[in-house]
């Protein structure tokens, strides 16, 4: 039961972060999953596990959220990924739900070019640590 709850909390927190990113009005909305064939942005959560568990069963769960982007214009892509990192790590308040709250977002991996496709689209990757408090 608690594994299902944690997955639900993590999914809700990731969707909330995606909503923050989509509010930045970048060249594309961000979607969960893999990059498509055209220009775009995607995110997906990596391995998560509680960082701390307290006697009252509250937990801090650091999510490793991978952000990938693809665009045929390197400057457009670089500005978008950098805007995501700057905007989310500088926020003073974060979304919350009934049993969870994002308490901090930091850069885990700086944005970097990881390749260029045959279609001449650049691919960039980065990741954020999204720290979520649960069972508030």
How does the language model describe each region?
Residues 1-57, 79, 91-101:
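Small/polar-rich, solvent-exposed N-terminal microdomains that initiate assembly or binding
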Residues 31, 70, 87-89:
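Predominantly extracellular/luminal cell-surface or secreted proteins
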Residues 46, 65-66, 103-106:
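Intrinsically disordered, low-complexity regions of eukaryotic proteins
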Residues 51-53, 73-77, 134-136:
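Residue-level signal for secondary-structure boundary sites
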Residues 53-60, 116-121:
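Short, solvent-exposed beta-strand/turn "edge" segments of beta-rich domains on protein surfaces
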Residues 59-75, 84, 122-133:
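Oligomerization/assembly interface segments of phage tail-like spikes and tubes
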Residues 88-136:
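Acidic-leaning, charged glycine-interspersed low-complexity segments
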């Amino acid at each position: 039961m608690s594994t299902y709850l944690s997955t639900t909390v993590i999914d809700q927190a990731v969707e909330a972060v995606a909503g923050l990113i989509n509010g930045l009005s970048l060249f594309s909305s961000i979607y969960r999953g893999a990059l498509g064939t055209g220009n775009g942005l995607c995110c997906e959560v990596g391995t998560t596990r509680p960082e701390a568990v307290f006697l009252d069963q509250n937990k801090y769960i650091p999510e490793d959220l991978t952000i990938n982007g693809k665009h045929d214009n390197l400057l457009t892509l670089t500005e978008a990924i950098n805007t995501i990192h700057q905007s989310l790590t500088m926020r003073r308040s974060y979304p919350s739900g009934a049993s969870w709250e994002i308490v901090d977002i930091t850069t885990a991996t700086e944005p970097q070019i990881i390749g260029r496709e045959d279609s001449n689209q650049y691919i960039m990757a980065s990741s954020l640590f999204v720290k979520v408090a649960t069972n508030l």
